[in-house]
């Protein structure tokens, strides 16, 4: 039996804790196993809280509180989205 391929891990960073909480709730409602956590040291964020998730990122989720979205690739992070409203 083949095991399913692992989900891609994304990290979303935010300007505010409220933004992180709102994004987390949105992903949970979509069925993702999203987790709020401290931002990894390699990344920087205004509020220090990020959301780790596995669904493919949809640009429609972006609002003024979203700072950036990264794809976690082995030992590094690749920028997928950066909010131009910052």
Name the predicted role of every residue range.
Residues 2-5:
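Short, flexible turn/loop "capping" segments at secondary-structure junctions
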Residues 7-8, 66:
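A structure-centric signal for secondary-structure junctions around beta-strands
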Residues 55-86:
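C-terminal structural segments of small proteins and small subunits
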Residues 8-11, 17, 21, 25-60:
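Amphipathic, hydrophobic secondary-structure cores in small proteins
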């Amino acid at each position: 039996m083949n095991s399913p391929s692992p989900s891609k891990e994304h990290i979303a960073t935010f300007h505010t804790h409220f933004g992180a909480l709102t994004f987390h709730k949105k992903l949970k409602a979509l069925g993702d196993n999203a987790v709020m956590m401290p931002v990894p040291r390699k990344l920087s964020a205004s509020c220090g809280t990020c959301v780790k998730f596995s669904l493919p990122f949809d640009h429609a989720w972006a609002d003024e509180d979203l700072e950036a979205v990264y794809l976690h690739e082995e030992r590094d992070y690749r920028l997928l989205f950066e909010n131009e409203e910052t």
